[in-house]
Amino acid sequence: MSKFARGFAALVAATVLIATLGAAVGTAVAEENKPDRHAGYYYPPITSSETYEARAVAMADADRSQRIKFINNLTEQLLSRPYPPEYAIFAKGDEAQKMIIVGRRPGTFNTIYRARALLATLTAVARSSRLFNEFGVQEYFTFFDLAKLFGFSRITISDGESFTHQIHLK
């Protein structure tokens, strides 16, 4: 991709971001302040959290159906391996806007460092994806940005026992 095309793409992305930021901020704050009805059912109470300022904005066609297809594709990849998956990944919420990753074995993601190691691995996978390569963002975007492209508002990762970390995507 030429420098001009990259610059133009960045300008368009910045314009879209500025245009949507005002509407998104109010919705995101309301979402963050709601009680987490999935804590205590799919994972233990939140033990830590952070906010990620995404470099991406949701794609125009990002909807519930697209998010479910995305999760289904990830799950199919996990299940196609010759060994049992170490974690389950699924979407919840009225619009499937909440991504949840839960370890299936004791000690899998019981520290923030192990959780971040998985998220870094998912970033490496995302950066090799056709989508990132088509947009020319494989050096800049992370797995969090990929989740934002699909319209996810948060990612929760847990060991399923005592540790749960939640990332709010802005």
Predicted region positions:
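Bacterial N-terminal signal peptides that target proteins for export
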Residues: 2-15
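C-terminal segment of classical bacterial N-terminal signal peptides
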Residues: 17-27
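Generic marker of residues within folded, mature protein domains
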Residues: 20, 92, 145-147
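N-proximal, solvent-exposed amphipathic alpha-helical segments enriched in charged/polar residues
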Residues: 28-97, 107-110
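Ampiphathic alpha-helical segments that act as solvent-exposed interaction surfaces
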Residues: 30, 121-125, 170
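Mature extracytoplasmic domains of secretory-pathway proteins
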Residues: 78-142
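A short amphipathic beta-strand at an alpha->beta junction
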Residues: 127-169
